[in-house]
Amino acid sequence: MWVNVVTEFGVKFLSFNILGGALVYYLAKILQIKYHGFETSNPKKSALYAIAAVTMSTCMITGLMILSNLNNASQVASSVQTYNLGIVINSALSWLILLSPVLIMKKIRKETWATTGVSNHNLKESILIGAILGIITLVSVIIYSSTSISVIRGNLNLNAFWALLNFAVAGFAEEFMYRGYLQIHLMEWIGKWKGLIVTSIVMALMHIPQRMAFGLSPNEAIISAVLLIPMSLIMGYTMIKTENILAPGIYHTFYNWINVLL
């Protein structure tokens, strides 16, 4: 089993981090991305406050996932997840609550939105890079899975539209918390690459309770989360190259949406 896990991790690392990283690098050069950098007063102190806020939000997310797991334990899971406006609104409100420690800390520290990657800086370039990455990943997965075009066409319905909005809410919320808030502060404190690696690992492992809520065993959930690290790294690298959460946010949305179409 572990041989398969290591092999899959290697394939994902090659696909996302080597090939994907090279694509992001050259797209940033071609589009002439402008780099402003991020400056925080007292980087160590700011990073520690960011860690505390993100830890609180992560604990809240974990608690919600555990409750969801307990609630679903006595129910027969549907093979097809349905989405609608109510689910999207509920997701948005839930994430607003889950992000409250980060938003409150940001307010207390008087940090601007720009210091979390939320600005019009490299706006068009970020949208384009995020869309290109998302489309390439979507096409690659479709080809690899051998799913017929007719099946995908059939799945492009109203449910898929609401699913896209729902994944956009979750994707951008996660990117704001981990990439825009935590990663930027860690980069300012411990350096660009260390900040990227630490944030990517933390974000990937945060999905363990989510996977368990979906019915995986603890061992399966850990393996699934570890296999998310390459994807997490490329999203973090995309944030570094664009300095805007739009690019990783769009990519994240498409990546999560793929399964709805297959």
List each language-model region with its residue ranges.
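Membrane-interface helix-boundary motifs at transmembrane edges
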Residues: 33-45, 113-122, 183-190
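Alpha-helical transmembrane segments of MFS and MFS-like solute carriers/permeases
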Residues: 49-57, 128-133, 165-166, 183, ...
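Transmembrane helix-loop-helix hairpins at the membrane interface
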Residues: 1-6, 10-26, 137-262
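Juxtamembrane helix-loop-helix connectors linking adjacent transmembrane helices
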Residues: 66-95, 100-171, 213, 220
